[in-house]
């Protein structure tokens, strides 16, 4: 089987991570793969905010928990130490789709490097808040951006789950 197809079929969402931060080289490889995602009209209208600062990571987790309505003490990032936030340029008509493809590439690249990942939502709501718009400005990011998702990344603690059987009736051929 082709390596890429095998990676697509064996990647799983991971919900239990070790606290150890992945090596910067590993994160850079994952990010690079994300930047090579297909995008509409070659605009490359998505960016990645790589969060490895524990204080900011924990602040994002707390806000994500609040937005999601989760109980106190729950970490919606499942203990993953690194958070790669994908944002789309609001002026780019394909930005949301482009950002979604970036997310897919990030998760596949993490899997290829034997790291775990999972897509966590609520980035849109986070980056609608003034303090996170200001964070982007402080980092030198100009323009209006919409949060697409958090790709949380780390070393897997335990075994990856087995894939659920694929449901029938999801492909329709027009021959």
Write out the residue ranges for each language-model feature.
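Acidic, surface-exposed loops and disordered segments
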Residues: 1-175
